[in-house]
Regions:
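Beta/alpha (TIM)-barrel catalytic core signal, keyed to glycine-rich beta->alpha loops juxtaposed to Asp/Glu
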Residues: 134-260
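Short, acidic/polar
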Residues: 31-44, 105-121, 165-170
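N-terminal binding-site loop/beta-alpha segment at the start of enzyme catalytic domains
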Residues: 2-82
Length: 260
């Protein structure tokens, strides 16, 4: 295997086929207590999901630390799971009283953000670090050099992007290798199937993760959902499956091997 395929194969073997997103575990959603979060971590792991997706900004910069404290109380060992986190968005919050939301991919901020994530998650390394969203002002060379150094230091195992277009991935170059792109994709948001995102990832051997894989199916009542619901009701009978299982199965059948 060449280097890129080897890295991706190693990551695939590390990540569970379904990934647990943590955005709504804390202040931006369920506001779970430490005990409740510990229980959810253990239950998730028992169900075969060993990969947890974070971002520094979740919960206004609070959810990573809450998860880290809860994970430390769990019966799950660090080497049995994979931590993904994202950086690059500067988000105004009580923890960071900024005047305006903006992007920051300077070497100083990349190091600052990663250091905080490592401390908050109570770990020595991140399995996969993603650039959260593309910035029109990002310095690709500076990003390359910083991430390459962080990988050599053992602080991150792999590097990827989130919400990047094919041309934006090309801008970042090939060293270090972009191994994953986390994009919005679901049965109610199918742009990635036709805008070239999935095609590009397949031809460049880049892994695909889908955020919001259930889409707006359970949230809205627009014509798309109205059209889908009777179809899924019939499929529920055929496959003895729930609606959410069918929505995930649809994604996972794609040849890009999408990880929801």
């Amino acid at each position: 295997l060449d280097g890129k395929k080897k890295v991706k194969k190693q990551m695939k073997s590390k990540f569970s086929r379904i990934i647990s997103g943590t955005m709504t575990w804390g202040q931006w959603g369920k506001q779970l207590s430490e005990k409740e979060m510990t229980g959810l971590i253990e239950t998730t792991y028992e169900l075969g999901i060993n990969t947890f997706d974070h971002a520094d900004i979740y919960g206004g910069y609070t959810t990573e630390a809450e998860f880290g404290a809860a994970f430390a109380q769990s019966a799950v060992a660090r080497e049995q799971v994979a931590f993904i986190t994202k950086c690059g968005i500067q988000y105004p919050s009580d923890a960071r009283p900024l005047k305006v939301k903006h992007y920051d991919y300077t070497p100083e901020h990349l190091r600052f953000s990663l250091s905080n994530s490592l401390q908050n998650l109570q770990t020595d390394y991140i399995d996969l670090l993603l650039l959260h969203r593309p910035s029109p002002l990002m310095d690709a060379a500076a990003i390359h050099n910083t991430l390459e150094t962080l990988m050599k230091e053992g602080k991150i195992r792999a590097f990827g992007v989130s919400n990047f277009t094919p041309s934006q991935i090309d801008l970042l170059g090939t060293k270090p290798q972009v191994t994953w792109n986390q994009i919005e994709c679901s049965l109610t948001h199918t742009d990635a199937l036709t805008n070239g995102d999935l095609d590009y990832c397949q031809t460049h051997d880049i892994g695909v993760m889908a955020w919001s894989p259930l889409g707006s199916y359970f949230k809205d009542d627009n014509p798309t959902q109205q059209r889908l619901r009777p179809l899924l009701k019939e499929l529920q009978k055929t496959y003895a499956a729930t609606e959410d299982q069918l929505l995930l199965a649809w994604l996972m059948q794609h040849q890009a091997t999408i990880y929801p």
